[in-house]
Amino acid sequence: MQISQERVSGCPKRMVFGPCGGVHDDGSCEMLPTPCVFDQLDGLPVATVGGPDAVAGGRPVEPPGSAWRPPTILTDLSVPPGDAATLQSTARLLAGSCDALLVGDHQDRVDFPPSTLARLIADAGAVPWVTLACRDRNRISLEQELRALALDGLATVLCVTGDGRAYDVRPDVTQAFDLDGTRLAALAASLGLPVAVAETPTARPVALRPRRLVYKQEAGARVGALNHVPGTALLAEFLDAARAAGLRMPVIASVVVFTDQRSADALAALPGLEIAAERRELVLTADDPVEAGIAAAVDEANLLLGMHGVAGVNLSGLASADGVQAAAEIQAEIGRRVREARGVRP
């Protein structure tokens, strides 16, 4: 399979396989005060157009005896950037309550490279998932990082285009966007890496999202990580449409974890993420918001894990404004309760 490199004119992220997950509710672009160019299209670009600069794609050959599988519980690892000691102590705290830890690639802070993060997490006794975004790396840098990850063989790589950097965050730094998430997934798969990809089911243009996830599967992804959907009916509708379009790979559904105003606001500020108003009120007005937040997350996780096609859940969010330790303890408790409900022993 050859992956098209023919960009859609007018996209500031120079995407071929858009739209990104940051399209606003009114159809406007995340980065410019103009309509998203993909929101005005009737369909997606053709995936199999070749050319001299095309990226080879396709599902990698599984090595004999390969034990890779999607995690049932994937927990966000949120720690201060560049702090290896805190990262590893937090990873150790969380390792027994989940199957893998996901570390982000953020637009507003400089952290270790993903390959270094993967080694630090693995050395702490946890299974790493690392996010690799196209925002801050040109194609050569992306290839270098993927080769380092492939050499170590430690991590699943979540390939994303990346959210645009805010106007007041490092205005002296350029944004690359040489590739988008689909083309990056093809490149990663061609190097034999286990590839995860993201999709936002509720972002405009909603009708194009299921097929876009299938394109990423065809590029070589093994699992889709979905942004939060405020209700199982909406998620089921998306998954039905995706399967009708050819989706075969499993998905990981997002569970929002918040226990106070700040952690709720941090989630709400993420592009394409929506928290049901009743869920927010239930947690924030409770006598014990921490327990209410934990219980709500456990209930959502168990509900999602019972859905057809959902292989796992991602415990996503800041969790608590009281610091890294408090947040990790909340995440760990959620993971333990979900495992207990599924009959998994510590």
Where are these regions (language model features)?
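Short, acidic/polar
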Residues: 81-94, 139-147, 205-215, 294-303
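Active-site-adjacent beta->alpha loops and helix N-cap segments on the catalytic face
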Residues: 84-85, 107-121, 137-145, 163-187, ...
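Charge-patterned, long linear interaction tracts outside catalytic cores
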Residues: 212, 216-217, 308-328
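Active-site pocket-lining/capping segments in soluble small-molecule metabolic enzymes
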Residues: 65-66, 79-81, 162, 172-202, ...
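N-terminal amphipathic alpha-helix/helix-capping segment at the start of soluble metabolic enzymes
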Residues: 45-85, 343-346
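Acidic (Asp/Glu)-rich catalytic clusters
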Residues: 66-67, 91-96, 115-125, 146-154, ...
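Hydrophobic faces of well-ordered beta-strands that scaffold small-molecule active sites
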Residues: 71-78, 99-103, 128-132, 157-159, ...
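Cysteine-cluster motifs in flexible loop/terminal segments that predominantly coordinate metals
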Residues: 1-55
